[in-house]
Amino acid sequence: MKILTPATSANLGPGFDSLGLSLKLYNEVTITKQNFTSVCISGEGSDKIGLKKNNTFVNIFNETMLYLTGKTPNFRFNFINNIPFSRGLGSSSSVIVGAIASAYHMAGFKVDRALVLNQALKYESHPDNISPAVWGGFTSNIVHKGTVYTQKADISSDLRAVVVIPDKPTSTKQSRGKLPKTYPMADVISNVSHAAFLTACFIKQDYENLRLASIDKMHEIRRMHGLKELFRVREIAYLSGALMSNLSGSGSSFLNLAHKDRAQTLRDILQLEFPEFKVEIYELDNNGFILQS
């Protein structure tokens, strides 16, 4: 079997730990039965010997298989990693979701997406990345009494994500450490209102209001100071037709949404201005993970 699990972009400005969307950029894992366990990696992480000896996907897959069947059979895992590591594009969520969903499939169980999502919460306590990897599209999420609840909206095929990917990785843990423990009431109210408005914009596909809706007062500026070029990325993106321009997850990547007829121009302008960074265009994914027998 093969599973494709998409990259995700979380927070989307004011939706800290609660909003996210899914990109057509996939990690692929092919799993076949054999007499011993083996791991083959190409793409991201292929030069890291430790990923073969202590592989998070394999570990979570085996934990899930043991839970479901009481056994951990041997398999060959062939990874094609396309999602950059530590760039705020949900590489870890892709691993977690992919491992759990594929274990259910290989164990002969029906793959229930809501169940996969809630199993994933054991490994990733914030649903803004794992939810779009499961459901696709734009997702608004809450966790209530240990259970994730999601509302999903499909994203128009007219939109493209123009993603600036710096050469500098970001640690989510370190990035969170830059944030204060308390916030002024006015900033909290601003984020709540903007997150609600942003959600309505995606549901109604009112993309012309995304720039206003995606204003954040709680985390982006503090995180962006770690890579000050990102302030210029946003400035240029808006001058060049972006509908919204926000830090992707905790960074270091920057997500810019644009109409597809503006995406290539926006990409070229950003690449010219930031030759040291990668700038890629992705379609938006509305399906979440894909299982292929």
UniProtKB/Swiss-Prot annotation:
Keywords for the protein's UniProt record, in alphabetical order: Amino-acid biosynthesis, ATP-binding, Cytoplasm, Kinase, Nucleotide-binding, Threonine biosynthesis, Transferase
Family annotation (Pfam families): GHMP_kinases_N
Location of the protein in the cell: Cytoplasm
Listed SUPFAM superfamilies: GHMP Kinase, C-terminal domain, Ribosomal protein S5 domain 2-like
Entry keyword Hydrolase: no
Keyword presence, Nucleotide-binding: yes
Organism superkingdom: Bacteria
PROSITE patterns: GHMP_KINASES_ATP (PS00627)
Recorded GO CC terms: cytoplasm
GO MF annotation: an example: homoserine kinase activity
Cystine connections: none
EC number of the protein: 2.7.1.39
Transmembrane segments: none
UniProt pathway: Amino-acid biosynthesis; L-threonine biosynthesis; L-threonine from L-aspartate: step 4/5
Reactions that this protein is recorded to catalyse: L-homoserine + ATP = O-phospho-L-homoserine + ADP + H(+)
GO biological process per UniProt: threonine biosynthetic process
Family assignment from sequence similarity: Belongs to the GHMP kinase family. Homoserine kinase subfamily.
Record function comment: Catalyzes the ATP-dependent phosphorylation of L-homoserine to L-homoserine phosphate.
Protein name: Homoserine kinase
Gene that this polypeptide is encoded by: thrB
